[in-house]
Amino acid sequence: MSDVAETLDPLRLPLQGERLIEASAGTGKTFTIAALYLRLLLGLGGSAAFPRPLTVEELLVVTFTEAATAELRGRIRSNIHELRIACLRETTDNPLYERLLEEIDDKAQAAQWLLLAERQMDEAAVFTIHGFCQRMLNLNAFESGMLFEQQLIEDESLLRYQACADFWRRHCYPLPREIAQVVFETWKGPQALLRDINRYLQGEAPVIKAPPPDDETLASRHAQIVARIDTVKQQWRDAVGELDALIESSGIDRRKFNRSNQAKWIDKISAWAEEETNSYQLPESLEKFSQRFLEDRTKAGGETPRHPLFEAIDQLLAEPLSIRDLVITRALAEIRETVAREKRRRGELGFDDMLSRLDSALRSESGEVLAAAIRTRFPVAMIDEFQDTDPQQYRIFRRIWHHQPETALLLIGDPKQAIYAFRGADIFTYMKARSEVHAHYTLDTNWRSAPGMVNSVNKLFSQTDDAFMFREIPFIPVKSAGKNQALRFVFKGETQPAMKMWLMEGESCGVGDYQSTMAQVCAAQIRDWLQAGQRGEALLMNGDDARPVRASDISVLVRSRQEAAQVRDALTLLEIPSVYLSNRDSVFETLEAQEMLWLLQAVMTPERENTLRSALATSMMGLNALDIETLNNDEHAWDVVVEEFDGYRQIWRKRGVMPMLRALMSARNIAENLLATAGGERRLTDILHISELLQEAGTQLESEHALVRWLSQHILEPDSNASSQQMRLESDKHLVQIVTIHKSKGLEYPLVWLPFITNFRVQEQAFYHDRHSFEAVLDLNAAPESVDLAEAERLAEDLRLLYVALTRSVWHCSLGVAPLVRRRGDKKGDTDVHQSALGRLLQKGEPQDAAGLRTCIEALCDDDIAWQTAQTGDNQPWQVNDVSTAELNAKTLQRLPGDNWRVTSYSGLQQRGHGIAQDLMPRLDVDAAGVASVVEEPTLTPHQFPRGASPGTFLHSLFEDLDFTQPVDPNWVREKLELGGFESQWEPVLTEWITAVLQAPLNETGVSLSQLSARNKQVEMEFYLPISEPLIASQLDTLIRQFDPLSAGCPPLEFMQVRGMLKGFIDLVFRHEGRYYLLDYKSNWLGEDSSAYTQQAMAAAMQAHRYDLQYQLYTLALHRYLRHRIADYDYEHHFGGVIYLFLRGVDKEHPQQGIYTTRPNAGLIALMDEMFAGMTLEEA
């Protein structure tokens, strides 16, 4: 195989067999894919063409992100459309289409074919790798052994945490105290362990180098380590009296091993040697008496002090005293197995599972049948961003298309831009593929950047023969496109070099000083550019065309959120507006989320003074303490606010949460007030984002109370991995953009700053790839040779990151350089710059001092590359010129549409304003109302368990996840308490409480929850009841009062006339002795003990909150469901009744307490069925 790549002509590339196309940054990869796509659609290319034209459904394009998929699909659709127009007109000014037209004989027929393709683009086979695997598994379910009805889960982090907590509980809880202490010194808990191993739980498992024996236990490892330490302690005690004389008579260099320190060291070690061994920590001074250290401190030609003790210390220090490798090896295997087992139990698939399932299926006995089926469907596959592949993905592609007749596999990517190792991408897989695919092509023209930018990158990466450290990743210089030859960046009348290095003065500097200084230099330079741009003195030129530099032209590329914060702070100090484009925080972690919760609680219950006062005190409402105090002292003014919030409550019930929030924000001028404050645009964006999430969740939940619970839960457990929760960009208009290098890949910016590009982080974990097999290897003992290999891979990836960063800029790139020293202690002499990517290229991998670094930079400089001393300037802020804007007027809405169709719920029908029943029961605590009470009694009971929205949700969730037939596991309860944010002291109470609930007889049949198997119960049964004609509160209320004595004593129903769908969730539906029952859990607090939960008290609670309407609606829903599912269904025979379980009142000593049962009249359910179907009811 030749390493020389052929320059690619997209219109002459042979479209059969396997081809590897390496597309350097800015060389038109997307353009090339689109051109090849058009050729394949029309069968163009002469002898290099595919044997026949293909449809969009036969042409597979695989890329690695949803965004790239959408971009490619749009680009291909646009090209198909434009070529079709060119065929119809038989002329074009597009060079690509012009060449294609020359090959098309029948342009009218080609136009028809392209029109068909354009119309079918929604069905085009453009997928992410995971989307491709999922589709192949589903379409070939029998060949792949794929189960039907499997749910795809995007995020497995919670599953992995639960599996890790389970591992910790099984292995660490039973440990003796002395071993548990050692484990605790390494990891404080399961979260810390998971942080250490999380990256190795995704994708294929790495090979463990020198794994511990299968039969080794923590106890045996601990005993072995303690014995080794105790042996050295005994040797020290035996020999310590001889050490002074032995060392004194040797050739030790007393300048490096002085007597005063020697005495201190001996005292410290002697004290340690007398102690019982409870820790693996060794005294730092023990190393001073190792044979190796003493040899280093002996004078030249002098006699080294020697003793068996020194050799024993050498051996003790040479081998790790750790249980880390043992715990991690077991954890990796067991957690992977636990997660896989749990996903099988739930019928779930993760993204990695789709890859492994298809990979396994293709390697099975029927694998060739599956491969043939996929090849038949997709004769041609183009794999975009192939440098980000992994071993499984490559095996899949190779198994399907390798050496197959009348197929093509086109692998397209740039190994120089492989920067996603943290996501599982594996550059070594690319290197293996490169050695196995013999046809290599390259794109040789950069269409993005100015000639100076292209030349400077070429020159920098040509400083060494192995710029990217591996011969399989060569650097091939590229040309600058003709269209870009006139691009220039002019500042104060002078054309600027394309690349400029800002070098800090001094012999050395630490990371903190480097980042602080460079952030200031970067901000000051950006300010100067912007001020010059306002004067017309900073211009982006293209020939005679020029435009002044604006803030949005400038991007600062960083490695982390911490670096972004430093740059943003420096820009803010100079009053330069900026935006961080890589923020992945959850919006539920913001103050706005908490304030939104208080606001919703106030709208839901404006009668509660404390709740309303909390909402008014939020920063988004804009009131100060004096305003609130004035309201407190003015009863009339307070009543006006209560009425205002009651109005919002009505809007919420009738139209939803977002219209309510819009009305509130409009009435209170919240948007205007926020935008007038610093950071207001960011806060307003978060409020609107949360509003959208609330609106979406509200369509899936049955009541306003449930929505408040939902928000409360997400604030307690935000998930920054969920894309819907990640904070949105407030604005990038006229702002300096700060973005991570990873996020910038594939993008371009006119002007780029890399302030911290000299920084690096030495690899600490010995995770690397075998240089022969390319297998991923994890050395948990961190042998020096393993660490060296891992460090080499770290540096190689940093070089690829540098390449990506430098190739983002169109006109100019500035770099912050410093004589960086990361080591502690003496910082004179050689710096550590050569360990960074930029330093390796500048210094050709050799250590240099600050003067040597400067010499290397000077040697690199030419017309395109320059350097300047970095000095922090003044803090003069940027003065923005006033920009006049045209006054805009919104068009006035001329009519209001009338539509009362909506999705509502039981809660939406029964909720109303403050009622008499609520006054009569002041201690009643509904699931989502009230606040947690302070526990004062010394003995904990279920009645003291916290009350409020979150505890109510927590109690419900316990019964959703529980296997009723099994004993309650205290460890499971403890874990649930921890996840729910409750103290572990509740575990015994909760375990006994749940057991009592499960074993309590529910009705006269004696059935209990503990008797219900999984096949006889349905948890959280969702239903929709159509409301065909407008439902009127008074008519429904009259009907149910006529048939149900409980309803007759209830407050009147009040709700707006509604038509549409009524949605709800039944906590539990179960079958017993052929009859079906519905059960609802209630966490209401009725009193201090179970005696408060009498039938009369529970009936009063049912009436006060109109639970009668709830069970009537639920019964109607279940009645309709059973009528369609059971052939000979009869309400009287099949429906057993309703059970309301007041959880706090269930008491095994008093079986009737806490359980309310009823059974709606059959006539009532029949008439409700007619009413909801839109039929007119006869007068009773």
From Swiss-Prot:
A GO biological process held by the record: double-strand break repair via homologous recombination
Domain UvrD-like helicase ATP-binding: 2-450
InterPro entries referenced in this protein's UniProt entry, alphabetically: DNA_helicase_UvrD-like_C, DNA_helicase_UvrD/REP, P-loop_NTPase, PDDEXK-like_dom_sf, PDDEXK_AddAB-type, RecB, Restrct_endonuc-II-like, UvrD-like_ATP-bd
Annotated DNA-binding residue span(s): 252-254, 511-512, 560-561, 761
Residues that coordinate or bind Mg(2+): 956, 1067, 1080-1081
GO molecular function: 3'-5' DNA helicase activity; ATP binding; ATP hydrolysis activity; ATP-dependent activity, acting on DNA; DNA binding; DNA endonuclease activity; DNA helicase activity; DNA translocase activity
Effect of residue 1080 to A: Loss of holoenzyme nuclease activity, retains full helicase activity, does not act at Chi, no loading of RecA on ssDNA and no recombinational repair
Sequence segments annotated as region (Nuclease activity, interacts with RecD and RecA): 900-1180
Self-association state and partner proteins as the record states: Heterotrimer of RecB, RecC and RecD. All subunits contribute to DNA-binding. The C-terminus interacts with RecA. Interacts with YgbT (Cas1).
Protein's recorded name: RecBCD enzyme subunit RecB
Taxonomic source organism: Escherichia coli (strain K12)
Organism lineage: Bacteria, Pseudomonadati, Pseudomonadota, Gammaproteobacteria, Enterobacterales
